[in-house]
């Protein structure tokens, strides 16, 4: 081994090394500061824009399906190899409807046949693309269909034909609409289905799909009773258009109505919608494309058809003075009942069509509508509700397993997950997968073994806080019972009758928060999901607030009912009530917690609409079942909260906040609005709230089935125990661990 000579370092070298070391430390420090600054800035930006870190969607993550994985169906064809055709199909009266067909190239070339999915829309079957974006389309025709592209590719790949139709008086079709959802659409739908069955690629079986208000159009197809129509999938369809969309509780949903009318007015006239609520779609509409796509190069014909659309009535104008279901539209001469699909429920039930309806808890009143449709089809309606609807035909198949109902924590048409407890607020549920399963079951006999729909109960509903999917055969689920609480002094809600008293508030006619609510369906479609601050303490300033004591672990599933005795100093009022979860408990370790006040659900009502009888909780919203509200007189009003499934954790409290619906979403009830609202309780005015509930958390219907030890842990929560032991923050105790209380009185 040779010893190395020691290095000789002069002063200059030492100085350079010292400087380099100093510079390295400086750069490292600067880099560290930059990284920290960038991280803080990014986090701050994400916070203020609502952006959160994505999560991996596995079983039991957010709203992910009870299956826990994607349903793939059977993939036969490459979506790039799709035969696309657009053409006019003439109706019997000579009116041309624009029809697009998508079929796998292989099916066309080999003269094979497949079932068809029909999509009838008044929002445009396709849109133009501006140069240079027109260079990058999948098809020879230069257009895009962003609202349905995922569905088209999925179903064509899986062995279906897809047919999109601009309904009469819209898109590129000819004619005009007497009004939305007129009976003419039923006749047109029958003819389109008949045309489909005669195409060389059709095997004679048809399904239909409809999202949002297009779902009402899909139900009109069922009302045609064409024998080829086998199944329909609805997502966010307000079946009761009056109560679930435009007049919840008889209160005009002004914002949704105006947005819908503005959108349809522009698209009917080949105008790119001018009121798009978010920046990205607005830029895309202005610079990428967005006009309705024409069928052919006949410009004169296209302009003529667009001109015919100007005869379509404007829904906002037509409903300007409308208050009751049986009021007539301003110029059309029909009542609102003739817009509502409820008038055709009998024909839909006797058509034999199987229907899968998705309803979002935070999508206007759509969950209630979806439940109503399922209950009607299965003959399980409350007798008072059934009396207001067409009689169920004797030939209707009322087997609940013939239909499906899925209720989840979604905004309008399932666009977003609005569960306040969802990790990263990320949607993990793929509606297209469940729709695919449903259609595979009904349209392909040999796919039933893959779809496995027959192995499941027909109802699936998601329980917020518990974050589990559950199943049932009837609605409401059989394990629930009603629990009544009474309002009383000191803004308390008690289990027993209370002394008489009253609480008055000064009415604030201003929006509570500058955030999105459940009622603006068009904004939901552009990714603005309903958002409610978790700490709603400031509501006390303008709402009458009542609160329960600490409660044991409780599941609430269904429609909460508020029987309210009130008076106002002016005759016109729209009432609103919020149900809230109050949590000021110490957190458990790893608890998914929202400390403060969390929104559960809400109810609105114009109290001129009384119940159909004194002991009923059902309103008809007809003129004959109305009353005049006089100043300073006490009235009883029944407010039905929008359906929800929610778990109230151990020692949480329920709060009810009552006030006047603000004009941000709703129109005023009249010219003279109240300045003072009084809530009366106790004695002859027993204001109360009725909860469809279960003491503890019901585990037997959780899907997939939980392990026995987990079920035992949950079931133990309903059992009374002897001592009180408040869990300290940071302990290992499960947030749903057995509730320890001196006595479980509920």
What are these regions (language model features)?
Residues 40-88:
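An N-terminal hydrophobic leader/cap segment in hydrolases
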Residues 68-112, 550-552:
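N-terminal cap/lid segment of alpha/beta-hydrolase-fold proteins
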Residues 108-197, 417-423, 663:
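Cap/lid segment of the alpha/beta-hydrolase catalytic domain
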Residues 138-141, 145-152, 157, 223-350:
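Accessory cap/linker subdomain of secreted extracellular hydrolases
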Residues 184, 209-293, 359-364, 380-388, ...:
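A catalytic-pocket lid/entrance helix-loop region that shapes and gates access to the active site
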Residues 352-359:
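Catalytic His-Asp charge-relay segment
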Residues 364-371:
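Conserved alpha/beta-hydrolase "acid-adjacent" motif
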Residues 420-722:
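C-terminal, loop-rich substrate-recognition/catalytic regions characterized by aromatic stacking residues
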